[in-house]
Amino acid sequence: MATARQGENTISPEAIPSNLPSRPTVLVFDSGVGGLSVYDEIRQLLPDLHYIYAFDNEAFPYGEKSQQFIIERVVEIVNAVQLRHQLALVVIACNTASTISLPALRERFTFPVVGVVPAVKPAAKLTRNGVVGLLATRATVQRPYTHELIARFATDCQILSLGSSELVELAEAKLQGETISISELQKILRPWLRLPEPPDTVVLGCTHFPLLAEELKAALPDGTRLVDSGAAIARRTAWLIANLDNPPLSTDKNLVYCLAITPKVATLWPILQRYGFDSLEKLPL
């Protein structure tokens, strides 16, 4: 049974002999637990890989942090993991970190680094009324990269952006087992809901938001389509893994790294087990 011991930096089940086959190691990173939505898509497509999930609960959330801080922090964390494990591929499952840190990561490391971007292009193709909502953090909504995506792929649509850090907190709360109020979501979505023609397609531009998909569907008008980039990231990961030349292999069990063992993290452990992880450790930087 998994236990959390005060003063220790590890949460893990009792030791069980492992006869796992050798397989490539994929690191999935996010500032919080939203990246689990991306990890879950990848794992469904590629169930036999060795997975490490790392989240920066010490500096969460990234939305209000400076670009320089995010670049240095993400590079430092990925480096700390790769010093302990031979990585075949890294997925930055955080929109904010992806739009900022990918060039630095790709310059520093030789393994492929995959990022997530708001699914503006597929949403523009799916919309029926030409009105697309972009639901993201305020930082993602404001970034030039997001504006470039819209200008490139959605010129024929009306894009209505809505930035919300509250939804990130609600997604984390849901994963902790809390019930999310639909009326609270409707207050956040009010700028869209009071329009004569609200978006019929909504881009979930933060990896936390797919965790709230059921609640968002209940809060939005009937028939609203939700679009995220998780499945596309999974397909990209599968293609890259298939085309790697002699990737490093591991027989380790799936592992989660956090930056601080806290009571909140300890309560996450049963949930992380359901996602297929076998241990949770503090990552020393």
From Swiss-Prot:
Family annotation (HAMAP family): Glu_racemase
Cross-referenced Gene3D superfamilies: 3.40.50.1860
SUPFAM superfamilies assigned to the protein according to its UniProt record, in alphabetical order: Aspartate/glutamate racemase (SSF53681)
InterPro entries for the chain: Asp/Glu/hydantoin_racemase (IPR015942), Asp/Glu_race (IPR001920), Asp/Glu_racemase_AS_1 (IPR018187), Asp/Glu_racemase_AS_2 (IPR033134), Glu_race (IPR004391)
Protein name, per record: Glutamate racemase
Chain sites annotated for binding substrate: 30-31, 62-63, 95-96, 207-208
PANTHER family: GLUTAMATE RACEMASE (PTHR21198:SF2)
Known function: Provides the (R)-glutamate required for cell wall biosynthesis.
EC number, as in UniProt: 5.1.1.3
Organism of origin: Pectobacterium carotovorum subsp. carotovorum (strain PC1)
Root EC class: isomerase
Annotated active site: 94 (proton donor/acceptor), 206 (proton donor/acceptor)
Record family assignment: Belongs to the aspartate/glutamate racemases family.
Gene Ontology terms for molecular function: glutamate racemase activity
Any matching Pfam family: Asp_Glu_race
Pathway in which this enzyme or protein is active: Cell wall biogenesis; peptidoglycan biosynthesis
Gene Ontology annotations of biological process type: cell wall organization; peptidoglycan biosynthetic process; regulation of cell shape
Catalytic activity annotation: L-glutamate = D-glutamate
Source species, domain of life: Bacteria
Keywords from the named record: Cell shape, Cell wall biogenesis/degradation, Isomerase, Peptidoglycan synthesis
